[in-house]
Swiss-Prot record:
Name of the featured protein: Cruzioseptin-9
Location of the protein in the cell: Secreted
GO BP: defense response
Organism: Cruziohyla calcarifer
Protein function: Has antimicrobial activity.
Tissue: Expressed by the skin glands.
GO cellular component: extracellular region
Amino acid sequence: KRGFLDVITHVGKAVGKAALNAVNEMVNQGEQ
């Protein structure tokens, strides 16, 4: 069962990183 939590944690981190990248892209485009 612990593996299931590991998968959720991994996916959560990946989604969070993707969201941060998207925000950074928007900020960079706004500055140009």
